[in-house]
A protein has these predicted regions:
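Alpha/beta catalytic cores of nucleotide-metabolism and tRNA/nucleoside-modifying enzymes
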Residues: 1-3, 214-235, 245-304
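N-terminal capping/small domains of soluble enzymes
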Residues: 1-96, 101
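Hydrophobic faces of well-ordered beta-strands that scaffold small-molecule active sites
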Residues: 20-24, 43-47, 96-100, 123-125, ...
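Glycine-rich beta-to-alpha transition loops that act as phosphate-gripper elements at the mouths
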Residues: 25-27, 99-103, 165-171, 220, ...
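Catalytic cores of alpha/beta
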Residues: 31-36, 107-117, 169-182, 232-234, ...
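Glycine-rich phosphate-binding active-site loops on the catalytic face of alpha/beta enzymes
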Residues: 47-52, 127-133, 186-196, 243-244, ...
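Glycine/Thr-rich beta-alpha phosphate-binding loop at enzyme active sites
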Residues: 70-74, 79, 130-144, 175-232, ...
Length: 304
């Protein structure tokens, strides 16, 4: 029988007790919730995306549940601003990565400089939120802007940082290549996909913003493809995200080339026990297949 150390993952100068991570989202906004998620079994935590100034976000409705395993959301990147969150996590002892969002290179540089001294593992640079103007994907669709942001973040922190990519107007492989060339530690793939739902009785969009981001089961095949192509063609660390509810989902991402996996929608469907459940399933899979550790299966699908 293999031990718990078989779940340990090491990549980009980081080490987690298991490959499951809290995805950036509504649970990552307070120290209390972050610590609770870590105690519930997550290997690492990612905060909600933080901006230079507080963002109120959109009015309700902001989330649509499609089938229990797929959602469309447009929260509008609501957050208290990075300075308020920095005060919230002053005493942080959990393995935490801060997600940052901005409109310009200077936004990211300012935040990184101020946050770098905190007890955190590193940063995730959100260049792919699909429903907020002048942020996220609108920034990420400009290859030269992405290049400039990644280059300046690298100059201003020695910590690992990952570029969160989505499916937009630019080939995700080109974006990942820029991230690699400008010395990002890796990428997270993928963010939600631009989507919409309309009330057939009223004829109006259901979300207050009209357009939102599709997440959950519906985007998993797209996410698997993106992880597979980035990992196989570029050979950089990839954190997989999109539709992970079970250990089988997580293993599929690992086989595609993900070094770790982020879970968001799965919490809404299965609760915070999903982290331990997935880790237990991965360990049983490794044992049944004769593998020694998670690293043995990362990218195995590249052989075919």
């Amino acid at each position: 029988m293999i031990g718990s150390e078989s779940l340990t993952v090491k990549f980009a100068e980081l080490e987690f007790r298991n490959p499951t991570m809290l995805a950036s989202g509504f649970l990552g906004i307070s120290q209390k919730f972050l610590d609770r998620i870590y105690r519930s079994g997550a290997g690492c935590l990612v905060s909600k995306s933080l901006s230079n100034s507080p963002i109120e976000g959109y009015r309700n409705p902001t989330v649509i549940e499609l089938d229990g395993k797929s959602y469309i959301n447009a929260v509008g990147l609501a957050n208290p601003g990075f300075e308020a969150f920095a005060r919230e996590i002053q005493a942080n002892k959990s393995p935490l990565i801060l997600s940052l969002v901005g409109s310009h290179q200077k936004d990211f540089v300012h935040m990184v400089k101020r946050l770098d001294k905190l007890n955190i593992l590193g940063f995730e640079i959100n260049l792919s939120c699909p429903h907020v103007k002048k942020m996220g994907m609108e920034v990420g669709d400009d290859l030269e802007m992405v290049r400039s942001i990644v280059r300046q973040v690298r100059v201003n922190t020695p910590k690992p940082f990952f570029i969160k990519l989505g499916v937009g107007n630019i080939d995700i492989l080109k974006l990942a290549e820029v991230a690699r060339d400008e010395k990002a530690s890796g990428v997270t793939a993928i963010n939600t996909i631009r989507a919409m739902a309309i009330n057939v009785q009223t004829g109006s969009p259901i979300l207050s913003n009209g357009i939102g981001g599709l997440s959950g089961r519906s985007i998993k095949p797209v996410a698997i493809r993106c992880v597979y192509e980035i990992s196989k063609k570029l050979g950089i660390p990839v954190i997989g995200c999109g539709g992970i509810f079970t250990w089988e989902d997580a293993v599929e991402f690992l086989l595609a080339g993900a070094s770790a996996v982020q879970i968001g929608s799965g919490i809404g469907n299965k609760g915070i026990g999903v982290f331990k459940s997935i880790s237990r399933g991965i360990r049983n899979y490794l044992e049944n297949k004769g593998f020694r550790n998670v690293r043995d299966i990362v990218g195995l699908a590249h052989r075919y």
